[in-house]
Amino acid sequence: MPIRRQLATSVKPEVLLVAPIYKPAQAKLEATYTTHSLLNASDRTALISEVAPRIDVVVTSGGGAGIKRALMEQLPKLKLIACFSVGLDSVDLAAARELGIAVTNTPDVLTDEVADLAIGLMLATSRRIAAADRFVRAGQWLDGGFALTAKVSGKRLGIVGMGRIGQAIARRAAAFDMQIA
């Protein structure tokens, strides 16, 4: 019995970009898929109306536009919402679940970077590093010393939320003998 082959199609899945994402990632999306962007659309409503019947995927970022039920319901072919972020708080997850739309994110992608920055900002604030830098650059050190600053070692650190990032911050704070509250 002969094997029937499905004809290859040149039709690319269509993607709606609703928030800015990392430029190299956007370039790959545009090379692989037919991409429509709301970012610079002069008439967002008209663009959505025009492309809605063909959109398979919506792509967004954590700091970007939210994906609400109303938009999902306008896109009858929508199968996936891809979030280039750790959090999903900008997506109506209940609506996506109810409408059978998969939602993805990028957990752990920036956990270490965010934790490192949090510790760096804590040190910069408590030790007044930016102010001390300005003091030295302005030549004020010739007139006297910069005021003493506070140490962080042995202090108590309050962390709101002990998810991946909170735990990574706590591990780093342990190196400063900090108590976690």
Model-derived segments and their meaning:
Residues 1-62:
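N-terminal glycine-/charge-rich "phosphate-binding" loop or analogous flexible N-terminal tail
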Residues 10-11, 31, 146-181:
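Rossmann-like dinucleotide/phosphate-binding beta-alpha-beta segment
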Residues 28, 117, 121, 168, ...:
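Rossmann-fold NAD(P)-dependent oxidoreductase module
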Residues 56-137, 147-149, 153:
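Phosphate/diphosphate ligand-binding glycine-rich loop within oxidoreductases
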